[in-house]
Design a protein with these regions (language model features):
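Active-site acidic carboxylates
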Residues: 2-119, 123
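Alpha-helical scaffold elements lining the catalytic groove of polysaccharide deacetylases
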Residues: 127-139
Length: 139
């Protein structure tokens, strides 16, 4: 596939309402002492595929902001993933086949959105592949 491919535009669509979501099938309960919040792929490059201030991205960003604030207040650690720009083709793996070159080091691509920026006690995991945890700096 071409190495010049980028992310396609994602058309607007409404988020499902609570009553449209399927019921939880697993009886899991949140254990605050074992919980963490993962804010995944909120860099300008990825979010730029959506139309700003329109659904789904506008309510998603507001929800992430609220979740992160509540997690911090509850003492739950907040982790972010951030992909490095200008990754070597061999490091991109399947991502290169599907999406081409990927993000660059530019300020238009690299930073996590200002409204969701990590706070001093948050953690940023460098993301190399689709999995946020492969070759991560998480110990």
């Amino acid at each position: 596939m071409s190495s010049t491919k980028g992310l396609p535009r994602i058309p607007t669509y409404p988020l499902p309402r609570a009553e449209e979501l399927p019921a939880a099938r697993a009886p899991w309960r949140l254990e605050r002492d074992r919980a963490a919040l993962l804010v995944h792929d909120m860099q300008r490059y990825f979010v730029g595929a959506f139309t700003p201030d329109e659904p789904p991205i506008e309510p998603v960003l507001a929800n992430i902001h609220a979740l992160a604030a509540k997690a911090r207040l509850a003492g739950i650690p907040v982790f972010y993933t951030a992909q490095e720009g200008d990754q070597d083709r061999r490091d991109r793996g399947l991502q290169a086949d599907l999406w081409g070159k990927g993000m660059g080091w530019s300020q238009d691509h690299q930073p996590i959105l200002d409204d969701l920026a990590p706070q001093p006690r948050d953690f940023v995991l460098v993301k190399h592949r689709y999995s946020a945890f492969q070759r991560s700096n998480l110990e």
